Amino acid sequence: MADTEAPVAPAEPAGPSPYEEKAPYYAKRIELFEKYFEREGTKVEEAKTTNEPIKVVMPDGAIKEGVKFVTSPWDIAMGIHKKLAQGSLLAHVDGADWDMRRPLEGDCSLKLFGFDDPEGKELYWHSSAHVLGEALELEYGADLTIGPSIEEGFYYDCFLGDRTLSATETEGIQKRMEKICKEKQPFQRIEVSRSEALEMFQENKFKVELISNLPEEATISCYRCGPMVDLCRGPHLPDTAWIKTVAVNQCSRAHWRADVTKEPLVRVYAVTFPDKKLMAEYKLRIEEAKKRDHRLIGLQQELFFFHTLSPGSCFFLPQGAKVYNKLMEFMREKYWEYEYDEVITPNVYNFDLWKTSGHAAHYKENMFSFDVEKAEFGLKPMNCPGHCVMFGNRKRSFRELPMRLADFGVLHRNEFSGALHGLTRVRRFQQDDAHIFCRQDQMEKELAAFVKMLDEVYEVFGLTYEMKLSTRPEGYLGELETWNKAEAALENALNGTGKEWKLNPGDGAFYGPKIDITVFDALKRRFQCATVQLDFQLPIRFNLSYVSEANEPERPIIIHRAILGSVERMFAILTEHFAGKWPFWLSPRQVMIVPVSELSRDYAHEVRTVLRKEGFYCEVDDSDRKMQKKVREAQLEQWNYILVVGEGEKTNRTVNIRTRDNVVHGEHKLEEGLLETLLRERKIKSLTCLFGVEKSAAAAAEKAAAEAAAKALEEASISKE
């Protein structure tokens, strides 16, 4: 008898998908884009008829010939070498960003950037963000908001109404992006008026808000790839086929304008690369970064934790406090060396202070404020206003300058709860914050000393860094002559380091130029920690002055500077940089002593007493576990040195040394061998074990001496002959 199936009830007619609901809007948007694109094309075709020759100056001074509104950066690159064109993603035309396929409009200078350049990566990932935006529209009918490139990759924020995206849906988004890339969709550019842009994006309230905030007379550029059209100043890749590999990493929640009272958004993160090898390397780095996550290591090593009773404020446990205090102690050593004076200032100030400093007008939403006896007070988010009060407390003489005030005061900033992230984004923190009050003629020397101090500190941690000089912006305040002198002083300080640095024109603060310092950890990730900023405005706001040599009142200049930045943030960076394997001088677990048996337990505690007297963190594992188990546990807990002591070591007053990486350094005298080496390792803040260095150095010296003796003997024999 044939199998029969139960009758299936007819399915309810499915409603239109979110994309189908938006399809008429998307179609209208494309129709308008094509209309304006045709208008652009007509202009270009008319301009081409002049056939006017142009000269293009390359970075090496070479001059290339071209035709106005015909020749593009791509054509110039192809004329030099095909590989140059294939590797060039972005052009700078007279310093301005330019699409590789966009025709040049006159005589100009030209510089090309590839994926290896930060500028090239930024463009590559920004173009990829448009592909992600297209995928989100096609898959979910999303209302797109903003989609920038970030440090490593990009994201797009979109509005899905009540819908959210789960981690399992990233695969579908990724497949859609891969399909778009294979379609080789060209990136097309148009320029429209404000009213035309409003018409084009009329059904996306987020884009309408962005457009409405622009001036009435603004010219707005838009880009299209496939059916997706977006507001964008560009430039972009020639087409989507330049994107070879895609990985959609995660979805998270966000809010429009980063305001929790506004519409909830879905943020989708992704990354792309021009070849599979780079993607494989990226995934390896991500896996390694997960293992090094400071939040994970913080729990494993019992360094710190967070609690819902005080979000964004860290509880440092005893082991974590040891590291934290060592960092502070290190900076205090440098302050002494560079003749800073440490001060202690209040945590709470009347809001009159913040009105004077300008924080009340520009920073209040990031401050914790409260009423005290009908007056408004605020927890300090930074130290500079308090230091200004300290400087202005009495009349100052030119002889007192430079005045270097250092402060480890506790700071509070009211970060959004959604932005809090381990130790890297907190509400309560401390900084190695200092302010230098100086004369104009002292600026250069003070800046040079700061950069030298910065280099010495980062070298101790094994951190590399890069520096950028950010010069005056368009809306700068103060005298041009003062700015010129300040920028020259910063430039001279940078040149004095002998290191390469970059110019970042127009990116200084309105109140003074600065050096932006980016640090790189062991995984080559970038972090902003240190800062040095000249300030001409705060002394004016607080009416600060000193009596000059001519017995006249003069305005000081303030240098804001920090090296660690937030101690909490640096703690997180170093945790991940060292992968929890703290160098001996910074380690909260320096020495574990393991007695072989009950007979050597007393000697183990004697060794501990000797080491503790010198300030070393050490413990004795006198549990009844087997010795091998004790050693293994100590290694897993990242004790730098494990000292095994038995009857022989007790008799000889020695210790048997091994490291957490199970490198055995053998038997050493307690005082002459162990203690002397540990003291030296701590003093020089070595990143490596000195026992191995000593042993190899001694062996090398012994070998060299033997070779020298053999050579001398040989020479003596020859002379006798």
Regions found by a protein language model. Give the residues of each.
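NTP/phosphate- and nucleic-acid-binding module
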Residues: 1-145, 149-151, 155-721
